[in-house]
Each structure stands twice: as C-alpha cells, then as structure tokens.
Design a protein with these regions (language model features):
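C-terminal domain-tail junction helix/linker
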Residues: 14, 182-247
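Short, basic/hydrophobic alpha-helical segments
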Residues: 64-116
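Acidic, metal-coordinating catalytic cores used for nucleic-acid/nucleotide bond scission
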Residues: 60-61, 89-96, 120-131, 149-154, ...
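Mobile genetic element proteins and their domesticated derivatives, centered on retroelements
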Residues: 3-5, 44, 50, 69, ...
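RNase H-like polynucleotidyl transferase catalytic core
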Residues: 27-34, 139-156, 172-174
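Extended, low-complexity cationic-aromatic segments
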Residues: 1-79, 83, 207, 211
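Active-site proximal helix-loop segment of RNase H-like, two-metal nucleases, encompassing DDE(D)
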Residues: 52, 143, 157-179, 190-192
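Short beta-strand segments
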Residues: 2-4, 118-123, 145-148, 199-202
Length: 247
C-alpha cells in the first residue's frame, strides 16, 4: 500500500522554530517579507517501510501531477514480485470488488481487470478522479482508495509531510521557491537513509499521551483540581443574592 498527497503551498516567509544561535543572542525574524511565489511538495509514501518519494514543484496541475505519479507508481510496481497467474478472471475481479464493500458510491470497474497488485490511498480531489488517470490505475493493477470528506487525516502521507516540513523549514526564512524545494527534497533524501515505518498508535501517540497527562495531571485542565476550593462570600454579595427575583 502507498499513500499520495500534495503538501503546500509553502510561502517565501519566515517560519518560526528553534535554531542554533550564540549564547545571549536570541533569534530574530523580520516582521515584513516579500512574496515571490510558492512551492508544493508531491509526496508518495510507503507506510510499511517508511520510504517516501517526493518532488518539489511551483504548480500542481494535472499536467504536472499525473506524469510524476505514473512514473513513481510504475517504479514501485517494478519492485514488487510478479503477480500470481493461477487465479481466474472472476477471482481477480472479486479481489478488486472486495475493496469497494460499504462504499456509498463505488467506482465502476472496467470489464477487463489485471491482477490487483497495489493499493493507493489519496484524497478525494477532482485531479485524482479524472477518467484517464483512474483508467491508467486500473490498467496497471492499482486500486485507488479515496479518503472520505473530512477524513484526510486517514491519509498517512500527511504525517510524513508534517515531519518533512518541520525539519526543512522551521527556523528558516527562504526567499525563493527554489530554496523551499531544495530544503524539502534534501530533507526527504536524509529521511530515506534511515526511514521509520508508520504505525497507528505507535510511539508518537504514546509520547503525546504522556505529554497530555503531564499537562492535565489534576483533571480535565491544568488550571483545575479534583476538589473545589472554598471561597468566602462578601456580605454585599450575599444581600444581593438573597433579594434577586429570579434564579
């Protein structure tokens, strides 16, 4: 299974974050900047291995996205073992149809289908739904799985995008889109040298839970306790409360 998403746009603006500074000299960021364009990051993520394929672009039209995605998916398919040929056409179709169970609007499958080789999770955007692109996926044994409305967090490519953005841009002030693209692509190359597989509810979730427990150790908020604190009421307040006509 692979997941795909487009991150951005990233502006040529100062990005807050920590950085190496001499002792006693805090980092400074300008309050004004000039916008000279934006950059986006095309991302194809393999959760099982943690490896990511990226490409920085200044525009993300279908003419840019589809050729890159087809090229990267073809490379991913080439690395897979050969498909099993012992299954009948009916069994191949049943394997495809199994991934559409429960969908409100299932995709119309072509009459002829190759063996199912790869699952692709991507957002429900117009550029991902063009007939030519979807038919190309079917012809190469790729089943598209679209995230529901408001469920883009299910796309695990967004998790690796947050990591790449934080490592590449925080504490920097890029002045051109080329600088943003170079930083993001270099960060992705560094990540692929020692990738981390994605695990739902893994160590990151445990760290967040421990941090939440530290912040809210006494109750639902760090500013409250389990036991209410008694407070003496002034006589004037008691007099006003005793004479109010309603609750």
């Amino acid at each position: 299974m692979w997941t795909e998403d487009e991150a951005g746009p990233f502006q040529t603006a100062p990005y807050p974050g920590g950085g190496w500074q001499p002792a006693g000299r805090p980092a400074h960021r300008p309050h004004e900047y000039i916008r000279v364009g934006t950059a986006k990051l095309l991302t194809l993520f393999h959760p099982a291995s943690g490896r990511v394929r990226v490409k920085g672009v200044t525009s993300c039209t279908n003419a840019v996205l589809h050729p890159w995605l087809q090229r990267e998916l073809a490379a991913a398919l080439a690395a897979l073992p050969a498909p099993a040929s012992a299954l009948s056409p009916a069994e191949h179709r049943a394997a495809w149809a199994a991934w559409q169970e429960g969908l409100t609007t299932p995709i119309t499958l072509p009459a002829e289908l190759p063996p199912l080789r790869l699952l692709l999770v991507l957002d429900n955007l117009a550029g991902h739904l063009t007939p030519a692109f979807v038919l190309w996926l079917f012809a190469h044994g790729i089943m598209p799985l679209y995230t529901p409305l408001g469920g883009s967090w299910l796309n695990m490519a967004e998790s690796i995008q947050r990591v790449l953005k934080r490592r590449a841009l925080e504490g920097t002030h890029p002045t051109t889109p080329a600088e943003i693209i170079a930083g993001l692509e270099a960060t992705a190359r560094g990540w692929n040298q020692a990738p981390t597989p994605f695990v739902w509810g893994g160590r990151r979730a445990a760290r967040r839970e421990r941090a939440r427990q530290r912040r809210h150790a006494l109750g639902g908020s760090g500013a409250q306790t389990h036991r209410p604190l008694r407070r003496r009421t002034a006589r004037a307040t008691q007099w006003r409360c005793s004479r109010q006509p309603t609750h």
